Amino acid sequence: MSIVRRTNVFDPFADLWADPFDTFRSIVPAISGGGSETAAFANARMDWKETPEAHVFKADLPGVKKEEVKVEVEDGNVLVVSGERTKEKEDKNDKWHRVERSSGKFVRRFRLLEDAKVEEVKAGLENGVLTVTVPKAEVKKPEVKAIQISG
């Protein structure tokens, strides 16, 4: 059994029991001075699921163009997803009432398991959802060799 943190934007009670670390996440950008970059990094949340055939990673990247995202494998087994959410052009006559969408650079790293076929990684960005598929190598079944008994 594994524990997976899930969120539901449609649940009106989802924020009733807040994550105690959310406060920390909101304070850190203010202290470090890296507000928008840290916010963009925090918003690049990804799911990783394993199927019998592959490891599948998904990230919601609304408004990010394919040219603004990089998917790489470094050090032989580390999947790196990085990119930049560009800031909307501001007009000096505009009066902002709320800014909640983050902008800046983001990067996520995942150490892949031994069964990952890193030479066959595929990625696609459709409707603001990045999907990275890392096929798995076939598990070789241990060979059973019958030994003749003499005598």
UniProtKB/Swiss-Prot annotation:
Any Pfam family matching the protein: HSP20
Alphabetized UniProt keyword annotations: Cytoplasm, Stress response
Organism superkingdom: Eukaryota
GO biological process per UniProt: protein complex oligomerization; protein folding; protein homooligomerization; response to heat; response to hydrogen peroxide; response to salt stress
UniProt GO MF annotations: unfolded protein binding
InterPro entries: A-crystallin/Hsp20_dom, HSP20-like_chaperone, Small_HSP
Domain sHSP: 37-151
Primary location: cytoplasm
CDD domains: ACD_ScHsp26_like (cd06472)
Compartments where found: Cytoplasm
Family note: Belongs to the small heat shock protein (HSP20) family.
Subunit-structure text: Homododecamer composed of 2 hexameric rings, each consisting of 3 homodimers.
Name of this protein: 16.9 kDa class I heat shock protein 2
